[in-house]
Structures are given as C-alpha cells and as structure tokens.
From Swiss-Prot:
Sites bearing Phosphoserine, chain numbering: S228, S249, S281
Short sequence motif Nuclear localization signal: positions: 214-217
InterPro entries referenced in this protein's UniProt entry, alphabetically: Groucho/TLE_N (IPR005617), Groucho_enhance (IPR009146), WD40/YVTN_repeat-like_dom_sf (IPR015943), WD40_repeat_CS (IPR019775), WD40_repeat_dom_sf (IPR036322), WD40_rpt (IPR001680)
Region (CcN domain): 192-254
Name this protein carries in UniProt: Transducin-like enhancer protein 2
UniProt-annotated stretches for the region Q domain: 1-127
Similarity comment: family membership: Belongs to the WD repeat Groucho/TLE family.
Any GO molecular function: transcription corepressor activity
Protein function: Transcriptional corepressor that binds to a number of transcription factors. Inhibits the transcriptional activation mediated by CTNNB1 and TCF family members in Wnt signaling. The effects of full-length TLE family members may be modulated by association with dominant-negative AES.
Gene name per UniProt: TLE2
UniProt organism field: Homo sapiens (Human)
Length: 743
C-alpha cells in the first residue's frame, strides 16, 4: 500500500511524548517502593490495633470475672449478715432491758447505710491507688449479671482493676510465671460443663402426665421444661428394672435424688425416655447414664431403629443388626471456651502433681476459677421413670437377630449382610471376609452357659471376679456384695461392704492383683480401699479428690498405683502405698468414663464424654495420642498382647483401633449404647454389653461374632476371670449373672 522506501515523518508537536524502557522501570520501581511503604505503615497500624484489641479483651475478661466474683461475694456477705442478725436476735433477749434497747438501737443504726457513705468509703479506697496507676476503663456490665449491688460495683471494680495494674507493675518479672499459673488453674474451671452421675432411676414410668416436668441440661440451651420428647434431654442411656408394687411419683426416685448416668448424645423418637439434669445441685451440669430401659429395647436415639427386636434369630456369625448413624457433637459454648486455657503436663510420673489454691488472671489478679463459668444457668432436675421391656429368655447358642434395614447394608460373598467393616487409612469402608479359623482354634470359646444368678437387689453398675474365681463382687446402691460362687446351689452374699453414702451408686470396683484389697468408687468424691484379708472386711484407707464422682478405676500391674476417671474429666493418679494423690492428667473437656492400661503399665487409655479417646505416657506424664469420634465413649479395653484398642460407643458401634497404624474395624451388632467391654487375658477375644440387653463375644481384631446372649434388661457391666473360664455381668434388673465359657 505504501512504497517501501518511504522516509519516516518527523515527530509533530501534537504527538505524545514516548518514555524509554529505563524510565518506565524507574517509575515502576518508585511506585512499588511507595506502595511498599504504605503497606508497611498499614501493617504497623494493623498490629497496633490488634494489640489494642487484645488489651481491651484482657481488660474485658478481667472485668467480667471480677464482676462475677463481686456478685458472689455480695451474696456471701448478705448471707453472713442474715446469720449474724439471727444470732443477735437470739442473744438480745438474754441482756438486761436497758442493754437490750441500746443494742437494738445500735443494730438499727448499723443497718442504715446511705449511698453517700458508700461513695465516701469507695473514694477512700481509690485515693491511695490514684498515685500509682490510673483505673482501667470499664465496659458496660455484661447481660446476665445480677444487679443487686449495682451502687458501688463499677467503682469498686475500677479500684480492683487499678490495684491489679499496680501489682502487675511491681511484679513484672513474675508475669510469665503467673500467666502460666493462670492457665493451669483455670483449666479445671471448664468442668462447669461435665457432670457426674448422681443416682439411678429405678421405677417404671406410669401412663399419664407425670413425666412432663423433665428438663434438659445442655450447654447451649436455657433452663426450663420442654414440651416434646424430641426437645427433652438427649443424654439417654437407660436400663429397666423390676417393677415396684406401687409406682412412686414420677417427680422423685426412691432415694429422692436425680438420675445418674453416662450420657447418650441423641434424642429419642417414639419413646418416653429422657434424662433429667442435676444442675440444681452443687455438682456441675448433669450429663449422666440413666440406668433404666426403654420399652421393647428401643434404642435411645432417633437415628437408631426404634422397632422392637425380633425374637427370630438367624444362626451364624455373619448375620447383622442395623447400623446406627453417628450423632454429631454440638460445638462447645463460646463463653466457656473463651475463658479457659489449655493445660500442659510435663512433670515425670513419680513427681507429685501440685496445683495452687487460686487462679491468676493474666498474671495480674487472683480470681477463683469457679467464677469463670457461672453464666451457665442451673436447671432444676427431676427423675424420670420408664416402662420396661418384656423378659427375654437366656440364649446360650450363637444367634443374631435380623434387622429391618439389613437389606441396605453391604454384603459379604456369602450373601448375608455384613456387621464387621474394615476402615482403611483413607477412610474406605469394606465388609470383612472372616478367615476359616475365625470361630475355631485354641482359646476361642464356642458359647457361654449361665451358671449362677446373683440377686443383688439393686441395679448392678459394677462387677469383678477374683483371680481364684471363688468370689464375685457386685456393686449397687451404697454397697458392694461379696458372693461365693465356688459352691453350687442358691446364692446369698457372704459379705456386704457398705461404701460411699447409702443412696449413692457404686460405679467401679477393682481387685488388687493379690486379691487382698478392693478399691471402690462411685457417686462420691471418695474412693474406699477395703482390706479383704482381715477376719471381717474393713475400710483401711480412703482417697478423696475434688471431683464429685468417679466413673471408672484401673490398677497398675505392680499394684502400686490406682487411676480414677473423674466426672470433671480429670484422671487422678493415686499412690496406694502412701494413700496420696501424685498426679492429675487433664485433657478431657467432659467426664472421663472408661480406662485401661497397656504396654505393661506404661501407657494409659481413657475415653470420655467429650467424644475422645486419649493415650497418656505414664513415665513422661504427657498425652501421646488423641482419637476423635462423633459419639460419646462409654467403654474401652486394650488387647493384652496386641496393638488393638476396642471402644464401645453411645452410637451402638464397637470400633477396634490399631494404636500404631491408621486403620480400624467397625462392628455393628449392638442395637443401642455399648456400656461395658472387656478383653480376655489371652487377647484372642473380648466381650461387650449394651443397653439392648445383649452380651456379645467378638474375635480380635476383626470382630467375628463368637456367641451372643440375651438378658432381660440392659447389661451395664462385665468382667472376665483371669483364666478366661467365667464371665460375670451386672444388669438393670437388680442382679448379676455368672456364665461359664464353654470351649
């Protein structure tokens, strides 16, 4: 279009100026440096604001805790004044008439304290502090604080805050130590959430409106009655008992106390069962195990099949019951989480574990740790009564009941629905094809035969059998009964060991390896150590902890140390020789419900109502592992000679975890909560019991069903003799059963 020899036209005055590449690079560099300077300035400003925010949060938390402390102190002083006034009223009549008038006038003058006098007193307290540090600016009073002493609360809070600042300035070099102390001391305060069991519900629920006053203890819900079964407590784990001649009022249990329990985190459908809480008592929020059964063994869950179990059974270990969905655990309360710090334990196993008597707030101000979570509203607790299921005959032969949803489950090559699944490291779940020797071989039982029935008379929450298999110990309400099972014939207890209080249930009893001592724990802060070698069994020592209840016990192989699972989530380590507490393992954020020892006494496994299983190193005094689940943990046991840990859950599943590899097995034969679990000493099999009245025997680790026995009520506890020849169970129909294992 244009000739190739065309000369370039000169630049006209109206054309834009052209930058060189170097100039453009310099311009970009200048702009980048400018933006970088702006970014640095904004970053410093952001860090400054974050620091100010942290400081304001610290001041707010300080004021928040002080307000609660002052409120408690106000009520305390009011109660003191009330009591002193009563004492004065009792003493004044003994004075002469003249002195009576003088004293009465003096008392009346003392009661007339004006607002001006209060302000003057507070001003006198503030005056010496004003020379050292200005008072901390205070935020408005949080909603929910009682305003009974509102006149001088803010001013007094300012005085305390100023005093705290002064203390911080004087003791600046100790701030780190005090802050650490604050974390150590405030960690136990999170136990306003978990709660211990208090008593067992023992009656049946009469038809009528009697059960309408039940309430729910949940950290996210306000107190008050609920209108429907689905809104009532989802902490349900129930066992039936014999019906009394006259059903008592549904408002109270026979002992007048609230129900106790390890909780189930699921709501009920088509069932009257629900759990009452015990927040009205001095104990923390009740999340408990109600030992009462549902009609027709209805699982305590809306996700489980609520139809009654079928009597028809299908022989063979490959039949299955239905799967229950795992219940998701609700998130913890924001308020309670914001005011607690984690606890680290690093002292050696033999070192005494000491805790101070007060907590510090950010190293500045001592505040009782109990003030932290007082925003949780107490709920008045009431007991509930339930209908019982029809009595089922004992079945010693292997049987597995059909399930209404079995057709939807994966199947094994034999064509029957599977109940055992292997879960790989990547979460893939596959049915387990059992090996040909799953149910045969040395040390594998064929079935169990009922040998003795021990009529304890109360719900049997704990059982153990002696090493000689001569005696069985059953724990119920307020006592442990000793039975001689070495002789045939009708059984009557040969001794009764009265423990705890008469109305408190025994939750665990453990024999020392020599069989000469028995340790008993339950719904009390005290553990009892019984001397069984004496002519008459007697208490030779008592161990007292700060927790209101003990859920489970374990004894070290050398019998020198005892471990107790407490309702506040702590694991207390006791020196049995000196009868002293030597350590506390703190990590569970809810009650610790079960415990076992592994690796020749060097590791401890605990399960909790916080949906976690934790492993502790007893030599180093620290937590090694933590396994999280979507269901509460009710029972566990470690295989004596293999690296497998069996866990029984509220969701009705039994999971077999490999403690060194990311693999596990899931077993789905139970139809409701798995309440107890025990390995045979050979490690080749174990048993589990549940609220579905079943005793299941499983092959380690893949869970082939060896045999299954049906009782007439929920089976709460179990034990296996040291020689693996006997199994003893405790149930909700006030009896224990001794089985002979047939090989």
């Amino acid at each position: 279009m244009y000739p190739q020899g065309r000369h370039p036209t000169p630049l006209q005055s109206g054309q834009p100026f052209k930058f060189s590449i170097l100039e453009i690079c310099d311009r970009i560099k200048e702009e980048f440096q400018f933006l970088q300077a702006q970014y640095h300035s904004l970053k410093l400003e952001c860090e400054k604001l974050a620091s100010e925010k942290t400081e304001m949060q610290r001041h707010y938390v300080m004021y928040y805790e002080m307000s609660y402390g002052l409120n408690i102190e106000m009520h305390k002083q009011a109660e003191i004044v009330k009591r002193l006034s009563g004492i004065c009223a009792q003493i004044i009549p003994f004075l002469t008439q003249e002195h009576q008038q003088q004293v009465l006038q003096a008392v009346e003058r003392a009661k007339q304290v004006t607002v001006g006098e209060l302000n003057s007193l507070i001003g006198q307290q503030l005056q010496p502090l004003s020379h050292h540090a200005p008072p901390v600016p205070l935020t408005p009073r949080p909603a929910g604080l009682v305003g009974g002493s509102a006149t001088g609360l803010l001013a007094l809070s300012g005085a305390l805050a100023a005093q705290a600042q002064l203390a911080a300035a004087v003791k600046e070099d100790r701030a780190g130590v005090e802050a650490e102390g604050s974390r150590v001391e405030r960690a136990p305060s999170r136990s306003a959430s978990p709660s211990p069991p208090e008593s067992l519900v023992e009656e049946e629920r009469p038809s009528g409106p009697g059960g309408g006053g039940k309430q729910r203890a949940d950290e996210k819900e306000p107190s008050g009655p609920y209108e429907s079964d689905e809104d009532k407590s989802d902490y349900n784990l129930v066992v039936d008992e014999d019906q009394p001649s006259e059903p008592p009022s549904p408002a109270t249990t026979p002992c007048g106390k609230v129900p106790i329990c390890i909780p189930a985190r699921r709501d009920l459908v088509d069932s009257p069962a629900s759990l009452a809480s015990s927040l009205g008592s001095p104990l923390p929020r009740a999340k408990e195990l109600i030992l009462n059964d549902l009609p027709a063994s209805t699982p305590a869950s809306k996700s489980c099949d609520s139809s009654p179990p079928q009597d028809a059974s299908t022989p063979g270990p490959s039949s299955a019951s239905h799967l229950c969905q795992l219940a998701a655990k609700p998130a913890p309360s924001t308020d309670s989480v914001a005011l607690r710090s984690p606890l680290t334990l690093s002292s050696p196993f033999t070192t005494s574990f000491s805790l101070g008597s007060h907590s510090t707030l950010n190293g500045d101000l001592s505040v009782p740790s109990s003030y932290v979570s007082l925003h949780l509203s107490p709920q008045v607790s009431s007991s509930v009564v339930y209908g019982r299921s029809p009595v089922m005959a004992f079945e010693s032969h292997p049987h597995l009941r059909g399930s209404s949803v079995s057709s939807s489950l994966p199947s094994i090559p034999g064509g029957k629905p599977a109940y055992s699944f292997h879960v790989s490291a990547d979460g893939q779940m596959q049915p387990v094809p059992f090996p040909s020797d799953a149910l045969v071989g040395a040390g594998i039982p064929r079935h169990a035969r009922q040998l003795h029935t021990l009529a304890h008379g109360e719900v049997v929450c704990a059982v153990t059998i002696s090493g000689s298999t001569q005696h069985v110990y059953t724990g119920g309400k307020g006592c442990v009964k000793v039975w001689d099972v070495g002789q045939p014939g009708a059984k009557t207890p040969v001794a009764q060991l009265d423990c705890l209080n008469r109305d408190n249930y025994i939750r665990s009893c453990k024999l020392l390896p020599d069989g000469r001592s028995l340790i008993v724990g339950g719904e009390a802060s005290t553990l009892s150590i019984w001397d069984l070698a004496a002519p008459t069994p007697r208490i030779k020592a008592e161990l007292t902890s700060s927790a209101p209840a003990c859920y489970a016990l374990a004894v070290s192989p050398d019998a020198k140390v005892c471990f107790s699972c407490c309702s506040d989530g702590n694991i207390v380590v006791w020196d049995l020789q000196n009868q002293t507490m030597v350590r506390q393992f703190q990590g569970h954020t809810d009650g610790a419900s079960c415990i076992d020892i592994s690796d020749y006494g060097t590791r401890l496994w605990t399960g909790g109502l916080d949906n976690t299983v934790r492993c502790w190193d007893l030599r180093e005094g620290r937590q090694l592992q933590q396994h999280d689940f979507s269901s509460q943990i009710f029972s566990l046991g470690h295989c004596p000679n293999q690296d497998w840990l069996a866990v029984g859950m509220e969701s009705s599943n039994v999971e077999i975890l490999h403690v060194r590899k990311p693999e596990k097995y899931q077993l789905h034969l139970h139809e409701s909560c798995v309440l107890s679990l025990k390995f045979a000493s050979c490690g080749r099999w174990f048993v589990s019991t549940g609220k579905d009245n079943l005793l299941n025997a499983w092959r380690t680790p893949y869970g082939a069903s060896i045999f299954q026995s049906k009782e007439s009520s929920s089976v709460l506890s179990c034990d296996i003799s040291r020689n693996n020849k006997y199994i003893v169970t405790g149930s909700g129909d006030k009896k224990a059963t001794v089985y002979e294992v047939v090989y």
